[in-house]
Amino acid sequence: MGSCECPALLLLLSLLLLPLGLPVLGAPPRLICDSRVLERYILGAREAENVTMGCAEGCSFSENITVPDTKVNFYTWKRMDVGQQAVEVWQGLALLSEAILRGQALLANSSQPSETLQLHVDKAVSSLRSLTSLLRALGAQKEATSLPEATSAAPLRTFTVDTLCKLFRIYSNFLRGKLTLYTGEACRRGDR
């Protein structure tokens, strides 16, 4: 193998391992800055949302699940420090991951879980793990934890959902909204 093939092989291996949610050591640290990467996750979230839209049986949860509020006040968001944005995204991603895992457990405990629904929930779990790794490589976790207490973001706004469709809608909205806004700004800032 030539020396020029090694970086290409590492990149190919990194892209193959991303869907597994495994931390990829050889991955370029700014992989999430490639809009195609984030778009792939957004398309997966939209697909899951679309599959569950017409779902009546097996899509209701036996309990409410807490999720992050995905509404964005663009005026406020643009005035926020990138560290405050990182806190909001990091906390939202953590809560969303917990919610999807809880939804996965509730679906597994239902009388007859649909294989299609289970597949989309499993993909969402894997995607959120991968996104967490990509954000960590971008420095979001460091940004979020380096803020002094006095300047930290307001407590994360939340609400509850009771169906898989609503959970996937929040998942899709979070990726298209706050996550896309944050990564866009963090990537631009890193390019300067």
From Swiss-Prot:
It comes from Felis catus. Disulfide bonds join C33-C187, C55-C59. One of its GO terms (cellular component) is extracellular space. Keywords: Disulfide bond, Erythrocyte maturation, Glycoprotein, Hormone, Secreted, Signal. SUPFAM superfamilies: 4-helical cytokines. The lineage of its organism: Eukaryota, Metazoa, Chordata, Craniata, Vertebrata. The keyword Repeat does not apply. It is found in: Secreted. Belongs to the EPO/TPO family. This is Erythropoietin. GO terms for biological process: erythrocyte differentiation; erythrocyte maturation; erythropoietin-mediated signaling pathway; positive regulation of cell population proliferation; positive regulation of Ras protein signal transduction. Pfam families: EPO_TPO. Glycans are attached at N50, N64, N109. Residues 1-26 form the signal peptide. Hormone involved in the regulation of erythrocyte proliferation and differentiation and the maintenance of a physiological level of circulating erythrocyte mass. Binds to EPOR leading to EPOR dimerization and JAK2 activation thereby activating specific downstream effectors, including STAT1 and STAT3. The keyword Secreted applies. The gene is EPO. GO terms for molecular function: cytokine activity; erythropoietin receptor binding; hormone activity; protein kinase activator activity. InterPro entries: 4_helix_cytokine-like_core, EPO/TPO_CS, EPO_TPO, Erythroptn. Produced by kidney or liver of adult mammals and by liver of fetal or neonatal mammals.
